[in-house]
Amino acid sequence: TINEFPLFAWLNGDLHAHMMGPPFLLLAATLCFAYYLTPAEAVWRRRGLLFGALPPLAGLLAVVNTWSFPSVAGLAVLTVLFAPAKARTLLPARVAEWLDTDDWRLDELLTLVIAGGSGAVVVLGGLVVSAPFWLVAASGRELALFPSRSGLGALVLVHGTFLLVFVPYLLRHALPRLRDGWRTAAMLAVVAVIALLSRAAAVLLFLPLIGVGWALLRWRDLPGGVGSRIGDRLRPGRTDATTSVSADGGDADGETDADDTANGGSTDSDGSLLPWPGFETVLLVAGAGLVLLVEFVYVKEQAGPGRMNTVFKTYAQVWALWAVAGGAALAHLVWQHRPGLGLSGGRWRPALQVFAALLIASTSVYGGLALTTHFASDSAYAQTDDPTLDATEFVDRVHPKEAAAIRWVDGLDGRPTITTAPGSYVWDGERNGGSSAPSSLTGVPTVLGWHHEIGYRGQKAYDRRAEDLRTIYTGDPNESAALLDDYDVRYVYVGPAERATYGSALEGITVSAVPGVTIEKQWDAVTIYEVDQSEL
């Protein structure tokens, strides 16, 4: 599988959906965080965040990066499930009061149903907002089950850095709450058996993270100390009326006192209040769920063999979520030392500080080396003496023969359809590699873009358009005219890539012989023909 991390993706510079989506996914996580921090009595604010702000954002993500669309709903479900404010307070007061129960099993089931329903509302709202996209988008993809799974070594190699942070973070919250080590060991043994039977090493690594994170956020004690109190939440002072927490999981006012214990906060053997994990644990559980999901389900498509593309696009989201969660968790390990936390105080304080320093230094090596040319090179792409945020400025330096023509296309009114040679991965027009630059750099639609469209549209659709383009450029004038009319083409672009692709034909490029096709603009290396649709 492909496993790109964000810095590599941005340095590589492919403006793929998996690069454009993370900022919007993190915006969705931010809205969920705002919901998480909102007091229970602010019902309409929470409803507005959940049902007013998230659905339009989900709809936007459906268009920008469809892979992230269901993830927004997943974040919404987990946030409603784990937030300090009880899920049922989202319902009308009379309904919430009627559904109130002392049976923790029914309460947990009700919470799951409301959280799932909230996610469904986000999905439906997103579908409505992005309806035009779904109505015109073509897809021959389908879900498939039980792909070849990742080995333990590969998973540790890709996710090991995050595990180095998340495991001690969860342990320091979990250890003080353990009441029965044997029961805990038995549960871990069950996880190991499941991993063995499912032949999925990911189950062994990530199911405990999900289970411990879930238990810390939902239940008062971990296995062994649960008893009849399993339905009680850890957070002190948690009522349907008032609940507010800070970013790191503490009270909004930063205070803890004896009243917290009286209100239901867990205590250790010394009577010290047990701190609870923050919203970063929600992101941790979300990312672990995504990693586990792609071990069993994948999208069957033509963008790569098996689950290659599914892992690629899903892990890009995991990186975004876990990078934020990992930063908060690492800061917690270094700075938060108090009674009630495991791995805290004494020799743990300097040990964790050294650990954090080594971790940051070791994981920063790639960035330091990869960015060297961005600050010490005067190549055609990296101009350190005159830096710019304009990602298209390189065209004038690297492709001066086509720069003026591309600027002309960029200045066209509206969105007229043009034709270009099918693009390849690298822009090298004289070697049959144009990358559809007149279209990709301007946003003007072209009949056929680069070959990666095969993964989106299918091999047959791509081949059909490729053959139609060859006919437009080199075929019989009458056949060319019919295709220009079918695709509503306004301009035909003939540059280095088009000459390399079609110029070797028997009669070369013959589009100029089509009635209604005339030269609109010409440069030394590029000729742009205008198509008069009324004369075709």
Where would I find each of the regions flagged by the language model?
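Membrane-helix boundary/interfacial segments in multi-pass membrane proteins
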Residues: 7-14, 18, 136-157, 199-204, ...
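Membrane-interface alpha helices of multi-pass inner-membrane proteins
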Residues: 9-10, 51-64, 189-196
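Membrane-interface transmembrane helices that cradle and orient dolichyl/undecaprenyl
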Residues: 28-46, 78-86
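Membrane-interfacial loop-to-transmembrane alpha-helix junctions, especially the N-terminal start
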Residues: 42-51, 109-123, 175-188, 270-289, ...
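Membrane-interface helix-loop junctions at the exits of transmembrane helices
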Residues: 64-69, 124-140, 193-206, 215-225, ...
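Hydrophobic transmembrane alpha-helices of multi-pass, membrane-embedded glycosylation machinery
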Residues: 73-82, 208-214, 330-334
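Signature aromatic-anchored transmembrane alpha helix within multi-pass, membrane-resident enzymes
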Residues: 112-127, 187-188, 260, 334-369
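Extracytoplasmic
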Residues: 345-354, 358, 362-536
